[in-house]
């Protein structure tokens, strides 16, 4: 059934825009250039406002997810990477559940990727329609059908640009993937802004600077009681404070420390005697994939809940999914879940919130750990990184595990890989929860994504440097 399903949508995949694979080896400096161009296009789209919107001042239901989804309110990047990640989530789950089957041949993999792109474009249109019809840019009846259609077209074209930019990097023209690049850029930008923002905010305590570090110097310069000024700079509410910044740096250090955890399995050449090597199985075997898929799941739950609560606010089942409240303390207006599944699947605002509602905190912890472990185990089966796939790769390279025959390699790898995937997913979820409870800037999920992505780029750079021999050869 699976192959038949992919064959059915094959004609549609053939008409999709596609980036051709490079016909020659792309030099590192060219990859850096293409990566920079991709990032520049993304950042420009983040600043171009949507044409035709009447207002974007209403409470933002996705304020808490925008850092992770690389989206920017009221701009061409309104949807961010949400459509492409959501399509990936759906396709991976369908493949993992064996509803559709993906063969090992390059043709089947290409067809699967094409189907994922097709669903990404369909989801882009669907999300654009939902955003417009739920009144995020003004009352649709007042804007008129023409303006609504123009906004939907803009969001669709921007979503297509994101898909193609991601494909450009993944095909080998640049470094890493577009999704990772956009997420890391957005999160790092948020952290720097929250630390050094010169924007002033009127609070009950008077006018304060948004940036935590600038606020520290401002409070010390303007307050006569220096001890109280320091206390306020470290613990002020509803605005970034120094404790948030310290928590962010601490989480960065912890995640980098855990990146070094791995098990090295001894392997040897089946052809050349005396040629030994190791195959590393990292603690974060599936890297940041579990947290990206978990974020996609929650963001789509938010979209559905917001859409239904706008139309059927008094319905019992709708309220069971999520009830929302608007808040504008210390920043732009935003909608926050206060009940239902959406509330329990969202992180507590602070450690004090954990003590106030331990049931919420407990359910959130179980959800994060369980979903990350599940997505991690599912991912290895559909991404070509399961024990069977690794054994096949080693066999193709004419390598075998020391002390084991080729036939027993899969059994031996099965002792490590599924465990590393599940436990690594649990650790990813646990670190995200810890960062949320500590109040790290950009959310626990965001910090975790930023660190793992930056570390991936560091590994790419080290690998390229070892192949080229020197820094000068890399760039010149």
Swiss-Prot record:
InterPro entries: SecY/SEC61-alpha, SecY_CS, SecY_dom_sf, Translocon_Sec61/SecY_plug_dom. It comes from the Eukaryota. Pfam families: Plug_translocon, SecY. Residues 54-76, 139-144, 194-240, 310-354, 442-445 are lumenal. Signal peptide: none annotated. PANTHER family: SECY/SEC61-ALPHA FAMILY MEMBER (PTHR10906). The SEC61 channel-forming translocon complex consists of channel-forming core components SEC61A1, SEC61B and SEC61G and different auxiliary components such as SEC62 and SEC63. The SEC61 channel associates with the multi-pass translocon (MPT) complex. This is Protein transport protein Sec61 subunit alpha. It comes from Gadus ogac.
């Amino acid at each position: 059934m699976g192959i038949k399903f992919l064959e059915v949508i094959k004609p549609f995949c053939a008409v999709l825009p596609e980036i051709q694979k490079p016909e020659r080896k792309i030099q590192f400096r060219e990859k850096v250039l293409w990566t920079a161009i991709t990032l520049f296009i993304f950042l420009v789209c983040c600043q171009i406002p949507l044409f035709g919107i009447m207002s974007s001042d209403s409470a933002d239901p996705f304020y808490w997810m925008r850092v992770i989804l690389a989206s920017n309110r009221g701009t061409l990047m309104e949807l961010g990477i949400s459509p492409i990640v959501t399509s990936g989530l759906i396709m991976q789950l369908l493949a993992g559940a064996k509803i559709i089957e993906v063969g090992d041949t390059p043709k089947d993999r290409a067809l699967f990727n094409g189907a994922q792109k097709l669903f990404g474009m369909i989801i882009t249109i669907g999300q654009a329609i939902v955003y417009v019809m739920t009144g995020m840019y003004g009352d649709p009846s007042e804007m008129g059908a023409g303006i609504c259609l123009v906004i939907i077209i803009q969001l669709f074209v921007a979503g297509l640009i994101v898909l193609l930019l991601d494909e450009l990097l993944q095909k080998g023209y640049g470094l890493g993937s577009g999704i990772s690049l956009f997420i890391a850029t957005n999160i790092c930008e948020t952290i720097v802004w929250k630390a050094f923002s010169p924007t002033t905010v009127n609070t009950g305590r008077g006018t304060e600077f948004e940036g935590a570090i600038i606020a520290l110097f401002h409070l010390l310069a303007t307050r006569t009681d220096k001890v109280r000024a320091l206390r306020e700079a470290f613990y002020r509410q509803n605005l970034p404070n120094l404790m948030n910044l310290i928590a962010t740096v601490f989480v960065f250090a912890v995640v980098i420390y855990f990146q070094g955890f791995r098990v090295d399995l001894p392997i040897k050449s089946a052809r050349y005697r005396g040629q030994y090597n190791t195959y590393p199985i990292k603690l974060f075997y599936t890297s940041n994939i579990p947290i990206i898929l978990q974020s996609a799941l929650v963001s789509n739950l938010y979209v559905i809940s917001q859409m239904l609560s706008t139309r059927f606010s008094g319905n019992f089942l709708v309220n069971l999914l999520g009830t929302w409240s608007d808040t504008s303390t210390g920043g732009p207006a935003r909608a926050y879940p206060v009940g239902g599944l959406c509330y329990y699947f969202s992180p507590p605002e602070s450690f004090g919130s954990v003590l106030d509602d331990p049931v919420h905190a407990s359910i959130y912890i179980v959800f994060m750990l369980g979903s990350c472990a599940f997505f991690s185990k599912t991912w290895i089966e559909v991404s070509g990184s399961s024990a069977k796939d690794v054994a096949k790769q080693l066999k193709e390279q004419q390598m075998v595990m020391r002390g084991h025959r080729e036939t027993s390699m899969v059994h031996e790898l099965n002792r490590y890989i599924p465990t590393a995937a599940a436990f690594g997913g649990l650790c990813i979820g646990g670190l995200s929860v810890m960062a949320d409870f500590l109040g790290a800037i950009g959310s626990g999920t965001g910090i975790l994504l930023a660190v793992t992505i930056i570390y991936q780029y560091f590994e790419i750079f080290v690998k390229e440097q070892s192949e080229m021999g020197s820094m000068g050869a890399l760039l010149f």
